[in-house]
Amino acid sequence: MIDKTAFIHPTAIVEEGAVIGANAHIGPFCIVGPHVVIGEGTVLKSHVVVNGHTIIGRDNEIYQFASIGEVNQDLKYAGEPTRLEIGDRNRIRESVTIHRGTVQGGGLTKVGSDNLFMVNAHIAHDCTVGSRCILANNATLAGHVSVDDFAIIGGMTAVHQFCIIGAHVMIGGCSGVAQDVPPYVIAQGNHATPFGVNIEGLKRRGFSREAITAIRNAYKLMYRSGKTLEEAKPEVAALAEQHPEVKAFTEFFERSTRGLIR
């Protein structure tokens, strides 16, 4: 079903069964598969391919040569009808690839809203990306990676499968991330190691001076006290009782499966 207010360029191919929302724009030489839903106001610039059981929300901008919802690169994939869901107001730049999920990973790759994925960024099968994140040019997420809100991943950085990137994290360019990166942390290198708290990012997002100080104190307990993480955890938990922002650390401890970067 194509809304009467949607624009479909004469050279675009929209297969029967696709749903195109009001005021959507499907540019020249785009291909939209039969199980795709494209929301109101979303723009496919040109030469964009959207395939599979893919739902794209409102007011997204998808640039030329992006491949969205294509078959994943997991060798176990046998053609199951897995899915990709993308939220609203994302900017997906040239040649970005976002693959649909696998049965083994829950069958869903999911992207939130208000993200920027720069040129050649890759989001593999079964990833979960939150909202207001940035993946810089050529940043790569392997399968099953989770990226929490407001995270920034630098150019040419690769994140190992099943890793978790916490909220407000900033990872420098050309890094290799093989373990989980806790919230608020700046990380860099191959293998990525912590370099402090993302203070400037927290200021920009309205964190108070008191909250930032508490986060820094928790970071020091984890990384600068000479204690093991297990030894530091009770003290971080005690700090979290006084400062709600620190609870992000204690909650992250429970989620982590690959261990924290050290």
UniProtKB/Swiss-Prot annotation:
Group of enzyme by EC: transferase
Catalyzed chemical reaction(s): a (3R)-hydroxyacyl-[ACP] + UDP-N-acetyl-alpha-D-glucosamine = a UDP-3-O-[(3R)-3-hydroxyacyl]-N-acetyl-alpha-D-glucosamine + holo-[ACP]
Key words of the record: Acyltransferase, Cytoplasm, Lipid A biosynthesis, Lipid biosynthesis, Lipid metabolism, Repeat, Transferase
Parts forming coiled coils: none
One annotated GO molecular function: acyl-[acyl-carrier-protein]-UDP-N-acetylglucosamine O-acyltransferase activity
Stored InterPro entries: Acetyltransf_C (IPR029098), Acetyltransf_C_sf (IPR037157), Hexapep (IPR001451), Hexapep_transf_CS (IPR018357), Lipid_A_LpxA (IPR010137), Trimer_LpxA-like_sf (IPR011004)
The UniProt record lists the keyword Transcription regulation: no
Cytoplasm as UniProt keyword: yes
Location of this chain's protein in the cell: Cytoplasm
Cellular component, GO, one term: cytoplasm
GO process annotations (BP): lipid A biosynthetic process
Disulfide linkage: none
Pathway(s) it belongs to: Glycolipid biosynthesis; lipid IV(A) biosynthesis; lipid IV(A) from (3R)-3-hydroxytetradecanoyl-[acyl-carrier-protein] and UDP-N-acetyl-alpha-D-glucosamine: step 1/6
EC number: 2.3.1.129
Pfam families to which the protein is assigned, alphabetical: Acetyltransf_11 (PF13720), Hexapep (PF00132)
HAMAP family linked: LpxA (MF_00387)
Family: Belongs to the transferase hexapeptide repeat family. LpxA subfamily.
Function: Involved in the biosynthesis of lipid A, a phosphorylated glycolipid that anchors the lipopolysaccharide to the outer membrane of the cell.
Quaternary structure annotation from Swiss-Prot or TrEMBL: Homotrimer.
PANTHER family linked to this entry: ACYL-[ACYL-CARRIER-PROTEIN]--UDP-N-ACETYLGLUCOSAMINE O-ACYLTRANSFERASE, ACYL-[ACYL-CARRIER-PROTEIN]--UDP-N-ACETYLGLUCOSAMINE O-ACYLTRANSFERASE, MITOCHONDRIAL-RELATED
Entry protein name: Acyl-[acyl-carrier-protein]--UDP-N-acetylglucosamine O-acyltransferase
Organism: Enterobacter sp. (strain 638)
Taxonomic lineage of the native organism: Bacteria, Pseudomonadati, Pseudomonadota, Gammaproteobacteria, Enterobacterales
